[in-house]
């Protein structure tokens, strides 16, 4: 024990830097002392920047007396021996100033409550007046009687319902306060089917006596009226027998319709178009400006007759179609525009070639007064197939010209007519008149024959000349029999031209003759 205490003392002295007498050089603790010296020297070398302070030998001795040799050996082996000695104070490392804490983000202002969306605008803002009787539930309504004697009122209105009816009677009297609303929306009509309603009527009698009181009126896309084995009659002014607007559809089968008032067509398609189909039906008008057909939509007649006894047989406005098959279309114009069938467009709806059409197949067209066709202020296509045309032979069968603008048919001098005429298995007799701001493109095909002549005349309003005025194509097997000298822009002949002593003068000055 005494030996251990002495060794510990020596260790403490070594720590304090006190020299060890050589007398103890052979002591068993000498290797330890040497190791301590080496460790101390290494520590001093590593920390050359800071000079160790003066050692207090008394404190070191007292500390060393408390150690045993095993303690020192253990510390040396573990590498923690230096922790038993007083160490020089480490240099003070300046701590960086703490970063200021970020200011809290301001709380976002609450978003304002969105304003309520306005109610969607109604697709149709139609003034249709009142209804004495209204059906808005699907069902069958046979043998009913519907009457209205008040102004601006429908006798029966079918709205958003699918119904069928047989043997009904619908009677309307009383005038409309504004004929525009009766024409555009069906206000004051005897029967109004509207807003997607469907009405299938058979053996039904519809009659009206008021001004602006249409017989049957269909309004809006998705609306459908079917009249079968029925009669429709109107006696007031501006009272069409059958009318559709806003893309409504109507079909008449085995039905008779008549009007007697002014401006009351038998068949009318008005604002934004629609479709009317007539099968095995008969239509008559007796009033002035009461055309057999007046359409800004599509009308098809099959096995039917139309007779306008005091005005034009038909007026086709804008890019729309009138088609006849196995039918008769008859007119007797008594006013200032002596033509039986007129094709024209508003100046803001001028069509393109072929979009406005008149088609007749296996049919008869009769004009009791005036020429047959006037094409003005539009682009149109007329197709005749195996159809009989009856008119005054001294008048042109086709007049394709501008106009003076008095009817609102475009601007004078720039409102020419542009027509494509197609003959299919057709014999046509009559002349064609075209003015200098208009043109005719004529195709004689499928063994057709044209007996007539074509004349180009100056535009009455002195408009700038169109680049072409008359181009004639004669297919193989078809024939042109000249009845007078003619002027054309070009002729393409794959068939036969019989000059009959007449000539054809081309735009380049060439004169063709037999």
Q: Where do the model's predicted regions map?
A:
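Extracellular beta-strand/beta-solenoid scaffold signature
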Residues: 121-130, 150-157, 179-192, 210-218, ...
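Post-signal peptide N-terminal segment of secreted/secretory-pathway proteins
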Residues: 144, 148, 154, 165-217, ...
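Acidic, proline-/serine-/threonine-rich low-complexity intrinsically disordered repeat tracts
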Residues: 41-54, 87-121
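Surface-exposed loop/turn positions within long extracellular repeat scaffolds
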Residues: 466-472, 480-492, 505-506
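All-beta strand scaffolds that present successive hydrophobic residues in beta-strands
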Residues: 138-144, 162-168, 198-203, 224-229, ...
């Amino acid at each position: 024990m005494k030996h251990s205490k002495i060794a510990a003392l020596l260790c403490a002295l070594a720590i304090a830097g006190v020299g060890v007498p050589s007398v103890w050089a052979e002591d068993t603790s000498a290797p330890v002392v040497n190791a301590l010296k080496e460790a101390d020297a290494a520590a001093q070398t590593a920390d050359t920047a800071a000079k160790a302070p003066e050692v207090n030998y008394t404190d070191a001795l007292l500390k060393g007396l408390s150690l045993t040799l095993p303690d020192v050996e253990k510390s040396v082996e573990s590498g923690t021996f230096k922790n038993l000695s007083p160490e020089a104070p480490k240099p003070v490392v300046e701590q960086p100033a703490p970063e200021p804490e970020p200011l809290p983000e301001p709380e976002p202002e609450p978003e304002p409550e969105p304003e309520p969306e306005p109610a969607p605008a109604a697709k149709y803002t139609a003034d249709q007046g009142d209804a004495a009787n209204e059906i808005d539930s699907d069902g069958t309504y046979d043998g009913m009687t519907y009457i209205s004697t008040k102004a601006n009122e429908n006798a029966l209105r079918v709205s958003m319902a699918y119904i069928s009816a047989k043997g009904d009677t619908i009677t309307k009297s009383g005038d409309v306060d504004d004929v525009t609303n009766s024409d555009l929306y069906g206000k004051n009509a005897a029967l109004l089917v509207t807003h997607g309603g469907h009405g299938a009527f058979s053996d039904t009698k519809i009659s009206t006596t008021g001004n602006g009181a249409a017989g049957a009126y269909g309004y809006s896309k998705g609306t459908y009226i079917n009249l079968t084995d029925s009669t429709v009659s109107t006696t007031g002014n501006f009272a069409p027998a059958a009318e559709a607007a806003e893309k409504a559809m109507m079909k008449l089968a085995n039905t008779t319709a008549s009007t007697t008032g002014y401006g009351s067509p038998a068949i009318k398609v008005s604002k934004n178009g629609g479709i009317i189909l007539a099968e095995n039906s008969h239509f008559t008008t007796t009033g002035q400006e009461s055309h057999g057909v007046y359409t800004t939509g599509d009308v098809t007649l099959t096995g039917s007759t139309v007779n306008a006894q005091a005005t034009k047989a038909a007026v086709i406005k804008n890019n729309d179609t009138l088609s006849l098959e196995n039918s008769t279309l008859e007119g007797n114009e008594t006013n200032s525009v002596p033509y039986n069938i007129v094709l024209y467009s508003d100046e803001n709806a001028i069509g393109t070639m072929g979009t406005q059409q008149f088609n007749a197949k296996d049919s008869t067209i009769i004009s009791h007064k005036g020429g047959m066709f006037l094409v003005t202020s539009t682009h149109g296509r007329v197709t005749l197939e195996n159809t009989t045309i009856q008119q005054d032979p001294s008048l042109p069968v086709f007049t394709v010209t501008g106009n003076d603008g008095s009817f609102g048919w475009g601007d004078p001098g720039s409102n020419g007519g542009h027509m494509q005429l197609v003959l299919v298995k057709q014999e046509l007799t009559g002349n064609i008149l075209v003015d200098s701001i208009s043109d005719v493109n004529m195709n004689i095909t499928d063994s057709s024959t044209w007996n007539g002549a074509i004349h180009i005349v100056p535009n009455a309003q002195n408009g700038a000349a169109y680049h072409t005025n008359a181009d004639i194509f004669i297919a193989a097997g078809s024939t042109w029999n000249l009845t007078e000298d003619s002027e054309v822009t070009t002729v393409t002949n794959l068939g036969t031209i019989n000059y009959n002593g007449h000539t054809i003068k081309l735009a380049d000055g060439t004169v063709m003759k037999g």
